Amino acid sequence: MESHAKTGTQQMVPAAPHGLALRSSAIVARGLRDLARDSNWLIKKIFTVRCSQLAISASGQVCAVAMMAPLGTERICLFDIELSAPIAMLAIPPDQPGGAPGLPAAFVYSPTARLLVAAWGAWPPELQVFDLHGKTFLGSFGGFSNLPEALAWSPSGKYLASATLGGREARLRLWEAADSRFGMPFTGNPVAELPAPSKLDDLLGAQTPETESVDDGTVAGFGRAAFSPDDGTLAAVVRVEGEWADDALALFDVPTLRRQHAFQTQGRITDVSWAFDGRQVIFCAAGQAYRLLADTMQPDPLPLGAEFCVCHPHLPLCLCYSSWLKNSAKGRLFLIDLERMAVFDEYPAEGVVDLRWSLDGSKAYAVTSDGLAYIYEPPLV
C-alpha cells in the first residue's frame, strides 16, 4: 500500500492485490514448516532492503525507514512478518518522494496495532498518526523542536509519551487520548510536560544517601520509556552526556509526571520494560540486564547480558537480546523465567534491533536491520 492524498484527505492505497490467496498459502506454508521444526524458533527473511530504524507491532508488522535503491532515498515502509512481504509505504500530504539517508525517526504502535504514531526527519516536525486498519492518514499533533528519541503508548491506549534529547530543550511530554473510536486519538497540548533537569544531581540529590556518590553529569534529556500495566507509572531513561556516562532511570506518576523514584545506573540504558504484574521493571544498561522490584526499589542483575528486553503480556517471562556473548563473537536471544530467575530457552542471533510479543502472547518477534526475523512460537505459551 502506498499513501496518497485525494481531495484533501489522505489514504493508503494497496500496491498489489495480495488477497486471501496469499494468506491461505501462508497458513499452509506455516503448517508444513512446523512439521519439520526442531526448536521453538523460526528464522525468515521479511525484507531485502536495508533499514536504518524500525519498530515491531503486536500484530507482526514492521514499520521501518527503508532505503529505496536505486533512488538513494529512504521511505517509511510497512512489512508483514508472516507474509514476508511489504504491505505499504506511508506518506503525508503532499506525498514526498523520500528523505535523505540517515534522518532520525521514531515510531510507536497502539496496543492493538490499529494505529501508528510516527515522526521522521523528512516530515514536518509533528507527530503523524496513521490508521492502519482504515488505511488512512488521520492527521498530526504535538509539534516539536527536537525529534523524539522515543515514543511510548500505554497498555490501555489512554496515554502517549514522547521523550526528547536536547539539553535545555529536552522534554518528557504526555498526551491523553480523546474519546474517539476512529478519529484522531490525540490532539492539542499535552496534559503534562516535564523539562529535563540540567544536572543529574537535581534529579537524584534529594533521595541519595550521603554515603553514596552522585555523578553530577550534564543531562542530555530523556530516552526510552515504558508505561506500567495499569497506566499509573511511566518509567523513563534520563540520559547523561558523555560516551561513558552513567544514565538514570526515573519513575513518574501518570498523568502528572511527578517523580516517584530515580536512581543512577552503570552505563548507558538501552531498553526498559514492565513485567505483566507491574511489580518489577526490567531494564538493560551497559550490556547487562537488571530488574527493579517495586517493594525495594533496588536494581538486581539478571543472569544474562542484554541490550534489549520485552516482557510477556500476561506471564512472568522476558525476551532479551545480547549482541555479544563471553567467549563468542555472536549474539543470542534469551527467554528468562522471572520467577525462577533462570534462562529456559535461547537461540543464536545477530543484528537484532527490536523485540515484541504478539498481542495474545502466543509468539515473540525479533527483527534485524537487514530484514531477518526470528519468531519464537513455543507450544505451551
Walk through the language-model features, giving the residues of each.
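WD40-repeat beta-propeller superdomains and closely related acidic/aromatic-rich repeat-like regions
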Residues: 2-381
